[in-house]
A protein has these predicted regions:
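Alpha-helical propensity feature that highlights long, continuous alpha-helices across diverse contexts
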Residues: 1-193
Length: 193
């Protein structure tokens, strides 16, 4: 047997070339940004908005059909606290609004397409909406779907940032705080003991 000593150049993050820095960023993103953390963040926001029994679905792989959606329900009283919904409903017939206040307890978001996870795979239904005229029902449904799609779009945008973007400052801070060094190809250097 023989023992061989190999010398390996080791670099701090700031010393790496730009191509290798991108490799390091990808490694750090995968180590620090987990799917559960993103899901919990979205669920927390939905909870603050008053969405009950929320389930979040997403596929953010930069592919056709990608997106984010959620299911759950919100009470009428919580829904009209949301500025967009409140302002949009105020433009509807006053008698119709009064009837909605009296008859609709919850608004439910249901997923009807299990293959994809974008906002167009969910529909909105109103508890006890049989009394509504088709035109009024369509207007009300459009208000909620417009709000829903805008909210999903914001979450989707945040998701892409969560999984695919990290600032240079955050990478430097992470590497410095953890005293991480790298080989020339961006692999983390672990000094043998």
């Amino acid at each position: 047997m023989r023992i061989v000593k190999i010398e390996v150049p080791v670099y701090r993050y700031a010393e790496l070339n730009d191509k290798v820095k991108e490799v390091v960023k990808d490694h750090i993103l995968s180590a620090t940004r987990d799917a559960q953390g993103f899901t919990d963040s979205v669920k927390h926001t939905l909870d603050v908005l008053g969405i009950e029994k929320a389930e979040v679905y997403y596929s953010l792989g930069n592919c056709q059909g990608d997106g984010l959606c959620f299911t759950g329900s919100i009470t009428w009283n919580k829904a009209i606290e949301i500025l967009y919904i409140k302002e949009s409903i105020a433009k509807l017939n006053k008698d119709f609004i009064k009837s909605c206040e009296d008859c609709i307890y919850s608004i439910n978001f249901y997923k009807f397409d299990r293959m994809y996870n974008h906002c167009n795979t969910v529909t909105v239904e109103f508890e006890d909406s049989n009394w509504m005229y088709a035109e009024d029902f369509t207007k009300l449904k459009d208000i909620f779907l417009t709000w829903y799609k805008a909210l999903c779009g914001k979450f989707e945008h945040q998701g892409y940032k969560w999984f695919y973007e990290i600032s240079e400052e955050d990478v430097v801070e992470y590497c410095d705080n953890n005293d991480i060094e790298f080989t020339a190809n961006g692999d983390v250097f672990v000094e043998p003991t």
